[in-house]
Regions:
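Primary recognition of N-terminal secretory signal peptides and signal-anchoring hydrophobic helices
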Residues: 2-199
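Short aromatic-glycine-enriched beta-strand elements
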Residues: 200-204
Length: 209
């Protein structure tokens, strides 16, 4: 009887220890990044504008990133004009009018110049006009970096000073505060992150990707 009681106590103690370890150990679950960025379509690209995700999404075709026309006007430059009747994308500067046939890689100016940029400048997807980010960038002051797995892009229209911290040891960036929160990405010793917000014992950061 004594042996049985001891065995039961050992089993109970071991089980309690397992519960404690599980309760106070970090989660190893990885976040679903498609869900995190709200990506519902295979070629959708989440737009991180400054430090916040925009409600709009870019698209990627043939390795080229495109903004829909409304997004171009809203965030970058409202001087682009869509001529649906002629199927043209038009941009006007003080010195010239730049035209491109939608679906073409060639632009032409009112000064008689032409250039093949090497990618489709603008295209329709259904009734929505999309314009290549690199083409928009010719006439708007912004920078962007495109990342894969899943597709998302960092866009800056302002370049202010940021508070930066260096990672002192390999660790994980988690979706929310708490040891049970899912892992978003890994950071290595020596990596730099941007400090967005400090709340009690947690820090909201942005990694380079």
């Amino acid at each position: 009887v004594f042996v049985a009681i001891v065995l039961i106590l050992i089993v109970v103690a071991a089980g309690f220890g397992t519960i404690l370890i599980d309760k106070y150990s970090y989660s190893k679950e990885r976040a679903d990044l498609d869900a995190y960025f709200g990506l519902m379509e295979e070629n959708a690209v989440a737009i991180i504008l400054q430090d916040e995700q925009a409600e709009e999404y870019a698209r990627i075709w043939d390795g080229i990133c495109y903004f829909d026309f409304a997004t171009v006007h809203k965030y970058f430059n409202d001087r682009f004009y869509e001529d649906r009747q002629e199927s043209m994308l038009i941009y006007t500067t003080p010195d010239s009018i730049i035209r491109t046939q939608i679906g073409s890689s060639v632009l032409e100016t009112s000064l008689g110049e032409s250039e093949d940029v090497g990618y489709t400048i603008a295209r329709y997807e259904g009734d929505v006009l999309y314009v290549a980010a690199d083409y928009v960038k010719r006439y708007a002051n912004f920078s962007y970096s495109l990342y894969e797995a899943p597709y998302h892009m960092q866009v800056y229209t302002e370049w202010n000073e940021r508070q930066v911290a260096d990672i002192t040891k390999d660790t994980q960036v988690r979706y929310q505060g708490g040891i049970k929160s899912d892992i978003l990405t890994e950071v290595k010793q020596g990596d730099s992150v941007i400090i967005l917000e400090e709340i009690e014992n947690r820090t909201k950061v942005k990694t380079r990707d």
